[in-house]
């Protein structure tokens, strides 16, 4: 697929999802398409991975499975992120955690890493810390949207501070692992995906603030 066309398609896809999920006539349809969007985005990241190899795909697979397993333990124990449970919106679940969650962690790590690489920051630890900061900032936007659309729900009224601390540490570990491979790149496609994630959830957050 032509890279320019693909970028435009992703922009239209996320814009349509943002608007469609808030229109009464289309909300149910577009909300049901969330898992497909996550699968498609992960597929694009794999197909257009800048340095494709068996080792690269093995690493990405391990990353996705490790992230999914972390969430399994988080849901099971309530000790990592806080007490929460997943709804039905994100699709098929294994051990009470959607398969798409591991894919989403994968997408967010490689996408936010591409932003960090573009900024030419020295040192793997510094890059990992900034990448984790970007992912945690994104989680601040995701949380109210996730609860509204039944991605997941928390046992309490407020999202626990523990969640954001754990998000940063988990993201830092995944970013640092990624930094210690030859795979990080300044992929413009991955940077676009990162930007779309921020804009998508910022848009949802604004819609919810104004009760749209």
Which residue stretches match the model-derived regions?
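Aromatic-rich, lipid-facing transmembrane alpha helices and their immediate juxtamembrane interface loops
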Residues: 1-212
